[in-house]
């Protein structure tokens, strides 16, 4: 695990990883997954490892030119320029809360966050079949199904400046393939893309402990609904960078669960 963390740390969550580094990371992920095969992610002894706050540390996606499985358009080439990523989180919490969060600085100056909050459940066999879509990879009994609410986009780190609700609801799957005290490894339900999540960086007293909790203040605020007025405010904030993509599409893409 230490070797895996050492390899992924300088890769900007996988975006800048070379083909050689990506191959080394993939081999380590495969080895850890194989060592954990047959384990029950929902067993009592694993609850403390599964249900906690996590930083998205790595996404095994070969190209992030237009979008990334963790962060959607925010983490595409243009998105990374406009919305400079400060932090990226995914939390699976008891009793049934799942949260994806990207914290950014608009044009490197204005802090903000995009938050997807939803409800998780253990995916049934029928649900796993639906979540696979066209993937050839079978999903295990450790798969989580998440029903996400409409995305919330907040300006000011906790939404104090402006909070908007933009985009549709969504349903996604995430197959848990490895757990230990430091990390969680999962595969996207429909893509099979590997994700590495770090819990040690979000634990109480760790560098990202406070930031990983700020999503709660964002979702507690009453957002403006999607409307012409909201879009006008949105554009005034400098976010209308969508000559090639409708505004709501930037916030409709689930993060780290594709």
Regions from the language model: what does each represent?
Residues 1-258:
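Soluble ligand-binding/transfer domains with enclosed cavities or grooves
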């Amino acid at each position: 695990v230490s070797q895996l963390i050492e390899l992924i740390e300088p890769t900007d969550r996988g975006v800048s990883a070379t083909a050689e580094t990506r191959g080394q990371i993939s081999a380590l992920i495969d080895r850890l997954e194989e060592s954990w095969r047959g384990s029950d992610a929902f067993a009592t002894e694993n609850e403390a490892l599964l249900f906690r706050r996590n930083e998205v540390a790595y996404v095994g996606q070969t190209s992030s030119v237009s979008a990334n499985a963790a962060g959607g358009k925010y983490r595409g080439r243009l998105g990374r320029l406009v919305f400079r990523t400060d932090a990226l989180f995914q939390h699976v919490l008891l009793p049934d809360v799942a949260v994806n969060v990207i914290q950014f600085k608009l044009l490197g100056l204005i802090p903000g966050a995009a938050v997807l909050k939803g409800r998780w459940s253990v995916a049934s066999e029928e649900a796993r079949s639906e979540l696979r879509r066209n993937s050839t990879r079978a999903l295990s009994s450790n798969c989580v199904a998440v029903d996400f609410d409409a995305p919330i986009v907040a300006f000011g780190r906790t939404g104090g400046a402006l909070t908007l609700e933009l985009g549709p609801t969504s349903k996604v799957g995430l197959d848990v393939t490895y757990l230990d005290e430091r990390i969680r490894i999962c595969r996207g339900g429909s893509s099979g893309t590997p994700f590495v999540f770090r819990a040690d960086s979000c634990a109480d007293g760790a560098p990202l402990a406070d930031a990983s909790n700020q999503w709660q203040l964002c979702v507690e605020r009453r957002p403006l609904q999607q409307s012409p007025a909201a879009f006008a405010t949105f554009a005034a904030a400098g976010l209308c960078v969508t000559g090639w993509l409708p505004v709501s599409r930037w916030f409709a893409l689930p993060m780290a669960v594709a």
